[in-house]
């Protein structure tokens, strides 16, 4: 149905998360309608990113330098580590400009159905880091999915043994949200995470 190069492009686009066959087809046609220079710039950006971006040896965030910009910032509070599953979670927290400590990126969540156990994540490195540094608090900023809950329980069990306070970010209602539209789990978490005013 498609010429071989177009079929290959669609096939490769489909491998991206959240991209199904129809979206891959739309993206491929869009790219081919644009000037050739734009497609080449996109290809060059992909090549540069894959060649120049690695992971920070300390926090495992994506970075072109080692250690990363965040780990090198002198004003960061080294006694607090925020644990996230993926670099995109770190970016979301950084956008708030509220957290002033350091991070640790696990590289995923425990998921036995997909064959991902604690050994496949950067948990050993986290425990070594907490044990070696003067860490007073470990904040678990992990999504409240089944895999996230499993990972949170596993981490809290092993991190607590090392001595620091283990906390978890609160989950609840979004700003501007209506109570009547919130699901039971969200409301329960909001009630659990309430604080004095």
Curated annotation (Swiss-Prot):
A zinc finger (C4-type) spans 56-71. It comes from Gloeobacter violaceus (strain ATCC 29082 / PCC 7421). GO terms for biological process: double-strand break repair; recombinational repair. InterPro entries: DNA_Rcmb_RecR, Rcmb_RecR, Rcmb_RecR_Znf, TOPRIM_dom, TOPRIM_RecR. The keyword Transferase does not apply. Keywords: DNA damage, DNA recombination, DNA repair, Metal-binding, Zinc, Zinc-finger. Gene3D superfamilies: 3.30.60.80, 3.40.1360.10, 6.10.250.240, RecR Domain 1. Residues 79-174 form the Toprim domain. May play a role in DNA repair. It seems to be involved in an RecBC-independent recombinational process of DNA repair. It may act with RecF and RecO. This is Recombination protein RecR. The keyword Metal-binding applies. Disulfide bonds: none annotated. One of its GO terms (molecular function) is DNA binding. Belongs to the RecR family. It holds the Pfam family RecR_C.
